Amino acid sequence: MRKILFTVLLCIGVLNLHCSKIRERKVPEFMTAKRPTPELVYQCAKHYKLQHINIVVAQSILETGHYKSDKCINYNNLFGLYDSKNKKYYRFKTWQESVKAYKQKVQYKYKSGDYYAFLKRIKYAKDPKYIHKLKKLS
């Protein structure tokens, strides 16, 4: 009987310790942030394993006018991602989804080399000075 009681108490103690460790794990700040900042976009891009993160963050700043544009505020679209099939800008539930979509819709095409040249090659932006502006920000 004592062995059973000891085993039960030991199991309860181990379970409590395990549960407290789960509670201690914190959700990364960027996951719960309602509004993007360069630092949070950087963390999110790193989490999703985007390449050339500094350039991607600069794109988010440039595309949204420092996160103040209509597309950023109302669509959570940090990169001006456009659905050419439906002729509409993508709408995301969260800005974090926009970062994830950037990897899926833009970076999947990138293999290696100069990222600025890649953006120019895929005609990411219509503005002929886009790369120059991006370099100033990144």
Say what each PLM segment does.
Residues L17-S138:
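Catalytic cores of secreted/periplasmic lytic hydrolases that degrade extracellular macromolecules
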